[in-house]
């Protein structure tokens, strides 16, 4: 493959631009056919992995016959709950035990929060695994994944306004490798700060997974906001029929259409949704069409609002930005933030937005071949996820400037 990791020095195969050499992240060195060791340094310490075998070969044993276990420092790079979610999902796919410590060590309230607790418990329930240390506030857990992936119907309630969309993100890769279709009913927060909303997940992430061969549907049954939560998502995942197809997105193109959703719950009199939509149209006025879907909702447990805006480009790229409402946050300010965020990513020449930049890494690492795309900027989340898929799955990753490359392991369903 031209420009692949497997043929000499890798290059960015971007037409219209000079090929650039990619910097490889360090890879675990082989000890023998079945066993590898690795030590990958993070910004606040090391990500240490115990003995583990190449993907697909099953569990191995370490010295004295002890079961091998993946050891991860949860404070690496972003030190966020994303490290935990990624690690648990990847360990479940490998069916290998995981010990993760220093969970969310950099956060004001470190340790497991309800949404993280539900994510690891959901993974365990789905694959028939066992957990140790799974309690609120815990800074370390041990996860022994099972090998069952039967599919079926599942219900998970976070019990707070914690992100149900991030729970969905944790479950999607596991469900893709289930024996039968999966149907998840997820209750919690659907639109809040510090987590992409459900519209972004549906219209951006799932839109990119479809050409990779993943059939995933997401529907908002009821919006949920901070602090009451109570939102409901319906997530349906079909098992993969073949290995995921790698994604190539190197030409950003020009915006050819903007499409947005302005949602307001129990705020019809204040015309919050209409004001967000109107401000978006004002800021985007020009030759590019702007389509805004104004939605009024009365089913949420509280007042709330959310705005999503997506851009479709001439080369088929889809980028998005969103923000939830908050007390004291004006409708017009929400629109200005969302439009500005999207325009910044487009101006950077990115082919994916700042959220998809790290979200797509896990799926690229599972695909059979090399995925390449341009990100708006390097972030701790991107760095963390690249290192995790290298270390746990054995995927190869590289970057040059804002070009990310991931050589997937080709995990078969």
Segments and roles (model prediction):
Residues 149-152, 157-161, 177, 204, ...:
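Phosphate/diphosphate-binding glycine-rich loops and adjacent basic-rich segments that engage nucleotide
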Residues 116-217, 234:
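A generic, well-ordered mixed alpha/beta core segment in the N-terminal half of proteins
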């Amino acid at each position: 493959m031209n420009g692949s990791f497997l043929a000499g020095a890798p290059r960015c195969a971007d037409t219209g631009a000079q090929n650039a050499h990619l910097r490889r992240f360090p890879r675990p060195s082989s000890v023998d056919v079945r066993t590898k060791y690795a030590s990958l340094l993070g910004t606040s310490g090391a990500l240490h992995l115990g003995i583990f075998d190449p993907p697909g070969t099953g569990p191995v044993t370490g010295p004295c016959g002890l079961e091998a276990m993946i050891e991860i420092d949860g404070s690496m790079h972003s030190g966020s709950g994303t490290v935990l979610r990624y690690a648990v999902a990847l360990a479940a796919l490998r069916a290998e035990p995981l010990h993760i410590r220093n969970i969310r060590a950099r956060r004001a309230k470190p340790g497991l929060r309800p949404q993280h607790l539900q994510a690891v418990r959901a993974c365990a329930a789905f694959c028939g695994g066992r957990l140790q240390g799974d309690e609120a506030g815990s800074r370390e857990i041990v996860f022994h994944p099972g090998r069952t992936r039967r599919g079926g119907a599942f219900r998970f309630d976070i019990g707070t306004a914690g992100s149900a969309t991030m729970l969905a993100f944790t479950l999607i890769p596991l469900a893709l490798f289930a024996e039968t279709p999966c149907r998840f009913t997820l209750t919690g927060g659907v639109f809040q700060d510090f987590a992409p909303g459900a519209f972004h997940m549906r219209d951006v992430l799932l839109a990119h997974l479809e050409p990779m061969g993943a059939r995933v549907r997401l529907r908002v049954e009821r919006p949920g906001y901070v602090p009451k939560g109570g939102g409901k998502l319906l997530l349906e995942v079909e098992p993969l029929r073949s290995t995921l197809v790698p994604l190539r997105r190197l030409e950003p193109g020009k915006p050819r259409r903007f499409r947005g959703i302005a949602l307001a719950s129990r705020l019809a009199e204040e015309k919050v949704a209409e004001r967000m939509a109107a401000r978006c149209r004002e800021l985007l006025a020009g030759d590019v069409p702007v389509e805004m879907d104004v939605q009024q909702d009365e089913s949420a447990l509280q007042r709330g609002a959310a705005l999503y805006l997506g851009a479709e480009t001439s080369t088929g790229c889809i980028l998005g930005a969103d923000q939830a409402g908050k007390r004291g946050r004006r409708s017009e300010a929400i629109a200005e933030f969302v439009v500005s965020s999207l325009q910044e990513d487009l101006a950077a020449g990115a082919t994916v937005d700042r959220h998809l930049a790290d979200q797509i890494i896990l799926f690229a690492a599972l695909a059979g071949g090399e995925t390449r795309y341009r990100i708006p900027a390097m972030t701790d989340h991107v760095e963390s996820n690249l290192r995790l898929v290298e270390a746990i799955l054995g995927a190869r990753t590289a970057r040059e400037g804002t070009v990310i490359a991931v050589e997937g392991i080709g995990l078969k369903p």
